[in-house]
Amino acid sequence: MIGDMAHKYRNRNKEFTMANHLVIVESPAKVKTIKKFLGSNYEVDASGGHVRDLPKSQLGFDPEHDYEPKYITIRGKGDVLAKLRKEVKKADKIYLATDPDREGEAISWHLMKALKLDELKNKQVYRISFNEITKNAVKASLKSPRDLDINLVNAQQTRRMLDRMVGYRISPLLWAKVKRGLSAGRVQSVALRMICDREDEINAFIPEEYWNLDAMLNVAGSKKPLDAKYYGLANEEGAKGSKSAIHSKEELDVILKDLEGVSYVADEVKKGERIKKAPIPFTTSTLQQEASKALNFSTQKTMRIAQQLYEGVEVKGHGTIGLITYLRTDSTRVADEADAAARSFVKEHYGENYAAAGEASAKNTGKIQDAHEAIRPTDITLTPVMVKESLPRDLFRLYQLIWKRFTASRMAPAVYETTSVKIRAGKHMFTTSASRLSFDGFMSVYVASDDEEEKKQVIGAIESGMELKLADLQPSQHFTQPPAHYTEASLVKAMEEQGIGRPSTYAPTITTIIARRYVAKENKNLYVTELGEVVNRIMKKSFPSIVDLSFTANMETLLDRVADGTVAWKTIIRNFYPDLDEAVNIAQKELESVKIEDEVTDEVCDLCGRNMVVKYGPHGKFLACPGFPECRNTKPYLEKIGVPCPKCGKEVVRKKTKKGRLYYGCEANPDCDFMSWQKPSTEKCPKCGSYMVEKGNKLLCANETCGYRMDKPAEEQK
């Protein structure tokens, strides 16, 4: 009996003394990593992200009561909170160790409120944060705890309320007039507009003809001819000249006539040196862009994998460790210790002359949030080779990209020896250039995916005044290209440049507009769907400020000011909501007066004989029987454009790819394979007889080698 009492006492004593510190993080993955760094008197548990939010079924705050938000426990988080309350009872000190950003600060604040930590009398509650999940970083944060930063909490709360206002008030209008289940978002609507605007630019673009003229010149002592490109007319004094384009075959013929029998003389030879600077470390935006281009990762996949690398993975010989610093950042700053370690690593493994001299990082701009670092490896000595066996393929590829970029950022520039030559040919001038890598510097470790390959040609021993022998003149016809469709990478870059969104919002925004089928992705390119076009038209007409880029960018700036405590969060809400409320009320009245009737077609239902109507589906328009639900017959919608097929004479119809990209094909498909990305015209090219396509108020020959163009008839011009 005494033994039993002693056993119970030991258990009670163990329960009291061994878990008197509680660390709360967001994810179970972090729990696993951090537990290995701390002693047995630390309990580490996870909240699983947010535990409270605005209720889904209502706005979540009352404008009549000064917009005070009403938070409720998220469904499924009751058990999580119950478990955390038990752990809190056992602990003397509680550390809120959520992510080091506004979202993380807000999660800690909600945990404080949900667990009533601010009401505890005999326990100490702290906020700790760390930029990397390593033993040193976690232990250092425990030595320097702080209070919650209510300004960061308010900034996140304001963003959440603004997003709720837009979604809750505008989405029902889209349900009523377009399709149930659609959503309008404050940032996603702007991203959609950017894609729609780019599509409009592409559709309105009219290609301009131009010609290149290459002179292939033999140089004494060189096996390969030198490729020199036409530059323009030379000045009387010599090679300076004026650059001019060749706009047509007629202009080309005049130049070719001038060049008959002339000598080609090197008028100016310049030798020099070009410095290629090392890249700066990754931010969230640049990591997403480079991972898209180099690894073909979506923004969502990049963030998911980076999250795993940050939270911790098992590395042979090192245990569980966070391999990279925090992944949501727009800073290029690097901690002094990490900078020194990287430079030392470079000197040891590559040589003294490969290490960067002086400041290697770009200065942060006014948009930079909080005191974050750039994305970098937590330990530069953990090279990709050392961790390869421990990581799944995609984790390894992203880690390798981050490691190489950061290492390169601490290295010396690459150096090229350059030679440029200006060649006079009668009254015309040609130019050529070449470069040779003389010192690879950072390029021994890292070359960005979009770096242009250096010219491979070698310029021989050419001196000013030397005559070169013409081997061949090679003209080539080209046409200017429209702006490129956005990719995920280029959209993120454009959003960052315009100040739309922040590191934490880029990937979710793009994921949402694709998931909602407003945008489709095909071969990396983003195309707006018919559904996206309809939503964008409504947003631009009824809520112009919501989709205005400068308005949205200014709102991000105001949120930054809330975060630094210079603007009160309610000031933003009080200014925003009344204007939104008025716009919604006006839009409701306007849309109520617009009755959207089903478009009746001449197509007869082959099951019941009714005239079929046009409906909208996930992939655009289709034909449906109006007798639904008695008759459920549907057919593809073939929208005829009144133009005969250039191949077989049947009707050309407007179609969309599965990804939502518009094109024109023959109604007789698959028997006829005619297809065009541009809208065909009834006009024939007077020059070559091919069919013509519409581009704005112009008609262009579909035969690219022809290049003929003309104005549309006046009655067809917009």
Locate predicted features.
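Metal- or metallocofactor-binding catalytic centers and their adjacent structured scaffolds
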Residues: 237-280
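C-terminal helical "lid" subdomain and adjoining coupling/linker elements of P-loop NTPases
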Residues: 177-183, 196-248, 294
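Intrinsically disordered, low-complexity regulatory segments
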Residues: 1-160, 232, 243-246, 253, ...
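C-terminal or mid-to-C-terminal helical accessory/interaction module adjacent to the motor/catalytic core
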Residues: 133-215
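Short helix-coil junctions and helix-kink-helix linkers
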Residues: 286-298, 492-502
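Basic, low-complexity terminal or inter-domain segments flanking catalytic cores
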Residues: 6, 12-14, 19-22, 32-33, ...
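Alpha-helical scaffold elements adjacent to nucleotide-binding pockets in ATP/GTP-utilizing enzyme cores
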Residues: 33-37, 83, 106-114, 137-141, ...
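Core structural elements
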Residues: 158-169, 187, 217-219, 274-286, ...
